[in-house]
A protein has these predicted regions:
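Membrane transport/envelope proteins' first extracytoplasmic loop
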Residues: 1-211
């Protein structure tokens, strides 16, 4: 009898452990998938941003959201004597809610707000380390992008929404969307992509977006 009881006990314990392990895996995968995607849901628009009506519908099904604009552009250095450098970069323009899921890692460890905010007459910009080497720059140097001059505040180590970044032809740079207004970078004819990352309630019905 005792042998049967002990076997039954360990059998139930094993089944319980497997169930707990399975749920832990599911939970971990869900969190990782959300971080890779950039949110619970990612919506992509080509060559435009969402209209006011579209944004209203998006807000109805989300608890929070962030807008990210991506495009390629040329950057150049300011006067370095007789040397003048240019490079193709992948620009990522973000708002104050970015990142919605996961964490962005930069060096030095500043907040995104501090790294990108306007100081004096220049907004900040975050760049990949490879761009500094390519253009012979350092943190604190200035970088010309469009009609605007940005100050390099930090280097980029990693970003969470890698699943929505697509193929990059050059080093990544991150800047504040507000700084784009007078840069001339999003003029008519510019090829850009807008991503809306959303956080939603569990089992959220998405039929409203489809229509």
């Amino acid at each position: 009898f005792w042998v049967f009881f002990i076997c039954l006990f360990f059998g139930v314990l094993t089944i319980s452990s497997i169930g707990t392990f399975r749920e832990s895996i599911k939970s971990g995968l869900k969190e990782e998938a959300t971080e890779i995607l950039g949110g619970d849901i990612s919506l992509t628009l080509a060559y435009r941003v969402a209209s006011e009506k579209e944004l209203e519908e998006i807000k109805k099904i989300s608890t929070s959201l962030t807008e990210v604009i991506s495009f390629r552009s040329m950057v150049s250095t300011t006067n370095q004597g007789n040397n003048y450098y240019q490079a193709l970069v992948q620009v990522k323009s973000v708002d104050k809610n970015y990142p919605l899921a996961g964490k962005i890692k930069i060096n030095p460890e500043l907040s995104i707000e501090d790294a990108l905010k306007k100081k004096g007459d220049k907004y900040g910009i975050i760049v990949e380390e490879s761009l500094l080497k390519q253009l012979n720059l350092k943190i604190g140097s200035d970088l010309i992008l469009g009609k605007s001059t940005y100050n390099i505040r930090a280097t980029l180590s990693s970003i969470p929404d890698i699943g929505s970044n697509g193929f990059s032809l050059g080093p990544k740079v991150i800047l504040n969307t507000t700084s784009l207004k007078n840069s001339g970078l999003l003029n008519k004819g510019t090829l850009f992509e807008t991503n809306y990352y959303l956080k939603t309630e569990n089992n959220q019905d998405l039929e409203n977006l489809k229509s």
